[in-house]
């Protein structure tokens, strides 16, 4: 068996990636989230495939086809809620994975980090299009509001929006193309994940201390396969609790009302995992400025390797940077909360302050604090 996995062309790739992979001996549970994201992606593709067998991408039947899945298809309710709540867990793991990368300086693996940012954008696009498919009130109005943001682009904006819609409003053509993209994108994500891993295995994993670990590495299997298994069990437990006890906890009640272009919901808001970016978008009164801030809220991650001014890679031994990091995390929680609130005071002011603080910490305070820490260490 050992000889086969080391000699067979296909088994050799798997062996070098998941079995005999030299891994730092001190990586903590924060490194579990990569494998958990792989599990989430697998769950989403599997459940999505079964949903696609029964779903009809047509404005007249989309809503009732989802109802049919929940009521008439064998375990259809389970598949549907696993898919919906699986997306939420996917984003929880994704944000934690990025947060861990920021904390321990993993952004210094520039190629891996940049592919990760492309992956984040792709996953967000996939999730957005998936949210439109049930064709409830929030699906329709969410699609209308978010796609309409492109009209802020000078000169080509209006034409671009109508091109995406396939008409003069969100309608049958929009739903059909969103379903097509929502179906194909997870496979593109899978390909990008392979590239992400390819670049990661070129450099090897980072570790909590941030110092090179060539002198102390252990094989991935059995040590980290067992460690990852614990994370897998906990994730599946969380998903089971969500799906079986509170399946609609993270959803919007408005989405149980069929889409009606003549009736606007009082508060249009996306799913919880987009609320931080939505709050940043709303905090700027100008439409084009808001769209620019929305894109920059994610794209700012690409600047992290350029703004790493610290002599130490990880934040493990940098208490000032740690304080700033946790303020940033708290700020993101505040932005998420604000994104779900109506546009009125004091929420407008809180949102604007939190948005300013978000960019201020990442673009200014973190690099300056790192320079200060270098001085304190006489580096």
UniProtKB/Swiss-Prot annotation:
<feature type="binding site" description="axial binding residue">
    <location>
        <position position="83"/>
    </location>
    <ligand>
        <name>heme b b562</name>
    </ligand>
</feature>
<keyword id="KW-0679">Respiratory chain</keyword>
<dbReference type="InterPro" id="IPR005798">
    <property type="entry name" value="Cyt_b/b6_C"/>
</dbReference>
<dbReference type="InterPro" id="IPR048260">
    <property type="entry name" value="Cytochrome_b_C_euk/bac"/>
</dbReference>
<dbReference type="InterPro" id="IPR030689">
    <property type="entry name" value="Cytochrome_b"/>
</dbReference>
<feature type="transmembrane region" description="Helical">
    <location>
        <begin position="77"/>
        <end position="98"/>
    </location>
</feature>
<keyword id="KW-0812">Transmembrane</keyword>
<keyword id="KW-0479">Metal-binding</keyword>
<dbReference type="InterPro" id="IPR027387">
    <property type="entry name" value="Cytb/b6-like_sf"/>
</dbReference>
<feature type="transmembrane region" description="Helical">
    <location>
        <begin position="320"/>
        <end position="340"/>
    </location>
</feature>
<dbReference type="Pfam" id="PF00032">
    <property type="entry name" value="Cytochrom_B_C"/>
</dbReference>
<dbReference type="GO" id="GO:0005743">
    <property type="term" value="C:mitochondrial inner membrane"/>
</dbReference>
<dbReference type="GO" id="GO:0045275">
    <property type="term" value="C:respiratory chain complex III"/>
</dbReference>
<feature type="transmembrane region" description="Helical">
    <location>
        <begin position="288"/>
        <end position="308"/>
    </location>
</feature>
<dbReference type="InterPro" id="IPR016174">
    <property type="entry name" value="Di-haem_cyt_TM"/>
</dbReference>
<keyword id="KW-0999">Mitochondrion inner membrane</keyword>
<keyword id="KW-0813">Transport</keyword>
<feature type="transmembrane region" description="Helical">
    <location>
        <begin position="226"/>
        <end position="246"/>
    </location>
</feature>
<comment type="subunit">
    <text>The cytochrome bc1 complex contains 11 subunits: 3 respiratory subunits (MT-CYB, CYC1 and UQCRFS1), 2 core proteins (UQCRC1 and UQCRC2) and 6 low-molecular weight proteins (UQCRH/QCR6, UQCRB/QCR7, UQCRQ/QCR8, UQCR10/QCR9, UQCR11/QCR10 and a cleavage product of UQCRFS1). This cytochrome bc1 complex then forms a dimer.</text>
</comment>
<protein>
    <recommendedName>
        <fullName>Cytochrome b</fullName>
    </recommendedName>
</protein>
<keyword id="KW-0349">Heme</keyword>
<feature type="binding site" description="axial binding residue">
    <location>
        <position position="97"/>
    </location>
    <ligand>
        <name>heme b b566</name>
    </ligand>
</feature>
<dbReference type="InterPro" id="IPR036150">
    <property type="entry name" value="Cyt_b/b6_C_sf"/>
</dbReference>
<dbReference type="GO" id="GO:0008121">
    <property type="term" value="F:ubiquinol-cytochrome-c reductase activity"/>
</dbReference>
<comment type="function">
    <text>Component of the ubiquinol-cytochrome c reductase complex (complex III or cytochrome b-c1 complex) that is part of the mitochondrial respiratory chain. The b-c1 complex mediates electron transfer from ubiquinol to cytochrome c. Contributes to the generation of a proton gradient across the mitochondrial membrane that is then used for ATP synthesis.</text>
</comment>
<feature type="transmembrane region" description="Helical">
    <location>
        <begin position="33"/>
        <end position="53"/>
    </location>
</feature>
<feature type="binding site" description="axial binding residue">
    <location>
        <position position="182"/>
    </location>
    <ligand>
        <name>heme b b562</name>
    </ligand>
</feature>
<feature type="binding site" description="axial binding residue">
    <location>
        <position position="196"/>
    </location>
    <ligand>
        <name>heme b b566</name>
    </ligand>
</feature>
<keyword id="KW-0408">Iron</keyword>
<keyword id="KW-0830">Ubiquinone</keyword>
<keyword id="KW-0249">Electron transport</keyword>
<dbReference type="GO" id="GO:0046872">
    <property type="term" value="F:metal ion binding"/>
</dbReference>
<keyword id="KW-0496">Mitochondrion</keyword>
<feature type="binding site">
    <location>
        <position position="201"/>
    </location>
    <ligand>
        <name>a ubiquinone</name>
    </ligand>
</feature>
<feature type="transmembrane region" description="Helical">
    <location>
        <begin position="113"/>
        <end position="133"/>
    </location>
</feature>
<keyword id="KW-0472">Membrane</keyword>
<dbReference type="InterPro" id="IPR048259">
    <property type="entry name" value="Cytochrome_b_N_euk/bac"/>
</dbReference>
<dbReference type="GO" id="GO:0006122">
    <property type="term" value="P:mitochondrial electron transport, ubiquinol to cytochrome c"/>
</dbReference>
<keyword id="KW-1133">Transmembrane helix</keyword>
<dbReference type="Pfam" id="PF00033">
    <property type="entry name" value="Cytochrome_B"/>
</dbReference>
<feature type="transmembrane region" description="Helical">
    <location>
        <begin position="178"/>
        <end position="198"/>
    </location>
</feature>
<comment type="similarity">
    <text>Belongs to the cytochrome b family.</text>
</comment>
């Amino acid at each position: 068996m050992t000889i086969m996995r080391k000699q067979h062309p296909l088994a050799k790739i798997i062996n070098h990636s998941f079995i005999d992979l030299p891994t730092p001996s001190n990586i903590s549970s924060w490194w579990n989230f990569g494998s958990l994201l792989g599990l989430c992606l697998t769950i989403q593709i599997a459940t999505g495939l079964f949903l696609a067998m029964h779903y009809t991408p047509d404005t007249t039947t989309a809503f009732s086809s989802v109802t049919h899945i929940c009521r008439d298809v064998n375990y259809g309710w389970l598949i549907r809620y696993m898919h919906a709540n699986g997306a939420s867990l996917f984003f929880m793991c994704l944000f934690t994975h990025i947060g861990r990368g920021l904390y321990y300086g993993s952004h210094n693996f520039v190629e891996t980090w940049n592919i990760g940012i492309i992956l984040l954008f792709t996953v967000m696009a996939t999730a957005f299009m998936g949210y439109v498919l049930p064709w409830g009130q929030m699906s329709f109005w969410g699609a209308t509001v978010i796609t309409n943001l492109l009209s802020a682009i000078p000169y080509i904006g209006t034409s671009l929006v109508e091109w995406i819609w396939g008409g003069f409003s969100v309608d049958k053509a929009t739903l059909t193309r969103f379903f097509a993209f929502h179906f194909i994108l997870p496979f593109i994500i899978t390909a990008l994940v392979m590239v992400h891993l390819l670049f990661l295995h070129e450099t090897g994993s980072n570790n909590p201390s941030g110092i090179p670990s060539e002198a102390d590495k252990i094989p991935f299997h059995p040590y980290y396969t067992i460690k990852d298994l614990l994370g897998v069990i906990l994730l599946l437990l969380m998903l089971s609790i969500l799906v079986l006890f509170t399946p609609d906890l993270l959803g919007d009640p408005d989405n149980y009302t069929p889409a009606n272009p003549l009736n606007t919901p009082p508060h249009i808001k996306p799913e919880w995992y987009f609320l931080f970016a939505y709050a940043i978008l709303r905090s700027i009164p100008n439409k084009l400025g808001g769209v620019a801030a929305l894109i920059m809220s994610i794209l700012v991650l690409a600047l992290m390797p350029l703004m790493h001014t610290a002599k130490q890679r990880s934040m493990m031994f940098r208490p000032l940077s740690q304080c700033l990091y946790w303020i940033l995390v708290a700020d993101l929680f505040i932005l998420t909360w604000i994104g779900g609130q109506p546009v009125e005071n004091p929420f407008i002011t809180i949102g604007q302050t939190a948005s300013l603080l978000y960019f201020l910490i990442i673009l200014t305070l973190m690099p300056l604090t790192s320079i200060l820490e270098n001085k304190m260490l006489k580096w």
